Amino acid sequence: VEAEHMCMTMRGVKKPGAKTVTSAVRGTFANVAAARAEVLSFIKND
C-alpha cells in the first residue's frame, strides 16, 4: 500500500508529497529472503 502521509504534509517536516509504504509478507516470502527479493524486484519493474 502506498499513500500520501498527511502528518508529513500538514505538520512536522511539512514535506508535500511525502509517501508512506506499508508491506506485509507471509509464508515463504517471510522466511526466504531470496524469494522475497525476487518478487519485489518483479513488482518494482512494473
Curated annotation (Swiss-Prot):
Record's keyword annotation contains Metal-binding: yes
GO molecular function: GTP binding; GTP cyclohydrolase I activity; zinc ion binding
Xref: InterPro entries: GTP-CH-I_C/QueF, GTP_CycHdrlase_I, GTP_CycHdrlase_I_dom
GO biological process, one term: tetrahydrobiopterin biosynthetic process
EC number(s) stated in the UniProt entry for this protein: 3.5.4.16
Keywords: GTP-binding, Hydrolase, Metal-binding, Nucleotide-binding, One-carbon metabolism, Zinc
Substrates-to-products reaction catalysed: GTP + H2O = 7,8-dihydroneopterin 3'-triphosphate + formate + H(+)
Binding, Zn(2+): C7
GO cellular component, one term: cytoplasm
Pathway the protein contributes to: Cofactor biosynthesis; 7,8-dihydroneopterin triphosphate biosynthesis; 7,8-dihydroneopterin triphosphate from GTP: step 1/1
Superkingdom of source: Bacteria
Pfam families the record matches: GTP_cyclohydroI
SUPFAM superfamilies noted in UniProt: Tetrahydrobiopterin biosynthesis enzymes-like
Enzyme class: hydrolase
Cell membrane in keyword set: no
Family designation: Belongs to the GTP cyclohydrolase I family.
Cross-referenced PANTHER family: GTP CYCLOHYDROLASE 1 (PTHR11109:SF7), GTP CYCLOHYDROLASE I (PTHR11109)
Subunit structure and binding partners: Homomer.
Name of this chain's protein: GTP cyclohydrolase 1
